[in-house]
């Protein structure tokens, strides 16, 4: 049997039932195609969600009341500008400028005060008092933007035992052109790249219990891997749930994440975020004109975007690389990148993640806590769809949470902490074996 990875397809349970299993050949538009068997009403919902995902929002007041309310402070004016073709963002644009897909998250260490504990319970972090939880690089008329992100890299050589050398780019992040005063010296800057919107309907169908079944916080099996779930606040449940989305698994549902992105990236209000993204010291932001409607993104539009993202096909993924798959297992990669889950509707999905948090070492620490995720802890990145990313974004792919890795090989070499043994084992492979493993990953 040559094929070792099954075709990726999405089955999403909605109120109307179960959609037919469908997939599409990897291409530039591979992440943007909808199911062919949607009903007329479902097509309307899908297209409504797609339109509000793609159209640019405008500042208030505007005659276009259906999509006004942008800002006053914001990073981008549409979802698609950070997720081109529904794929991930890049560090730089084709013109060499820092992409809008790169955002700077800001936070300070929590203390025992009631205010800080309330932040930690509902947001999972404590924002900077002046600049909030995320730097805004744009502002509407008469509202100064907060600042700009500056990235510099230092090339660090890594030598394999066989003498081969690979250079890693070590990033340094700085905020410049700050318009609201100096940044607090205790504020951490965590830079994140917009992720690809792959298989969100699948992830939604993985139960909390299925994820928790793989927890091993105390490493009772003594394999050096101690994954833990992130218990996070759910706006929908008004209580705690297992986080599945974002780089630190800090969000429990797709709809929660959509609302967070609207608030953080565009300062658009929803039922989950009722106020603009202004801090108490930003008077121009607080006094800026408001949209006609109290809620910029009403429930029906929020629901439509949620539906749109859950009814997208997944590119066909097959691998015939038996050697690469065997090495992936032998090195222990599959201990965290668990190949498959069974969903609530009994479909087995090949996702290559456990959705748990793992200590990835000091080199990848971003100084930021999100709920139970500590500074050097990250959610295991799902590996599905790698083979389609370059076609979808039209350029070379940047890997890891901040895009520092320019190749899958570099991404592996950044692994530390719980993944250090696997990385060291990879480094001791022959060049041909390393290439075989990387080829396998590139076909997922």
Identify the residue ranges that each predicted region occupies.
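Residue microenvironments linked to proteolytic maturation
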Residues: 188, 194, 203-204, 208-304, ...
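An amphipathic alpha-helix signature
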Residues: 251, 255, 409-413, 438
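Short glycine/threonine-rich turn/loop motifs
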Residues: 21-240, 244-247, 314-406, 410-413
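Short helix/strand-capping connector loops at secondary-structure junctions
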Residues: 411-424
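Hydrophobic h-region of N-terminal signal peptides that target proteins for export
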Residues: 12-20
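Post-cleavage N-terminal segment of exported redox proteins
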Residues: 19-65, 86-90, 255-322, 339-342, ...
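Sec-dependent signal peptide recognition
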Residues: 2-10
